[in-house]
A protein has these predicted regions:
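Buried hydrophobic residues that stabilize the cores of well-folded domains
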Residues: 1-238
């Protein structure tokens, strides 16, 4: 166990990837057999699962990242969708297939828990975990393993209006054994109809950032950033 709990969570997902490495193809076939409905999308290549990214706000905060759009018509023989989504009879998303060859299967081992295993080129390259309570997403974690180890986690806090705070963590281990760690916090506001209207960065008290032991850590944003508000133009209720 490391001194950083976020690093421990990353290592937990890496262990999950190793656990499923010998059987990922078989599990993908089994879950593919449960698909009763498919949806198709364009765009969203830069986002985990594209249109159905588990994070409700990732594309609102990260510039240049879009969810893409669902196609209203089935693709023709001359037209290949960027992403194909498969749903089971419970209307749960169970498979994701990208035109570039990457695939992912999603399963639900217990109530309130969703696990995703992504693979490409004969190896597991992505593991994700979502935890829900009372119908709301509480945490979303994702670890990319294609080049080094890139871990991302979002922790959500709600009030009577909806999403109020987001804690955003990233922890990376590179092939040269260097590491980086960041923790950002955002506060959200809503319109009268309950849709997200704006957000801003707020200070976060992270003891591990204060320690900075052995890490190449991005400095916290200057206080002037905390005075800036960013308008959300997309209508989204969270």
């Amino acid at each position: 166990m490391s001194m950083n709990p976020i690093a421990d969570e990353m290592n937990h997902l890496i262990g999950t990837a190793r656990e499923f490495q010998p059987q990922y193809r078989e599990m993908y076939r089994e879950l593919s057999d449960t698909v009763v409905r498919r949806e198709y999308a364009r765009g969203g290549q830069m986002l985990h699962r594209g249109y159905y990214c588990p994070s409700p706000v990732y594309d609102l905060i990260v510039g240049g990242v879009k969810r893409g759009r669902l196609l209203k018509r089935l693709p023709s023989a001359k037209s290949t969708p960027d992403v194909t989504f498969g749903f089971n009879e419970k209307d749960q998303l169970v498979t994701v297939e990208r035109s570039g060859g990457g695939k992912e299967f999603i399963f639900y081992p217990e109530d309130g828990l969703e696990l995703g295993i992504g693979f490409m080129s004969d190896r597991v390259c992505l593991v994700s975990e979502c935890r829900f309570a009372q119908g709301r997403l509480q945490t979303y974690s994702c670890c990319y393993l294609a080049h080094g180890k890139d871990f991302h986690k979002e922790v959500f806090a709600y009030d009577e209006e909806g999403l109020r705070y987001l804690d955003w963590y990233t922890f990376c281990e590179y092939d040269n054994n260097k590491t980086s760690y960041e923790h950002e916090k955002y506060q959200f506001e809503h319109d009268e109809d309950g849709t997200l209207s704006r957000y801003r960065a707020v200070p976060c008290d992270d003891p591990f950032l204060r320690e900075r032991k052995g890490l190449s850590q991005t400095m916290e944003a200057p206080f002037s950033v905390y005075d800036m508000e960013f308008e959300i133009t997309q209508k989204r209720k969270v």
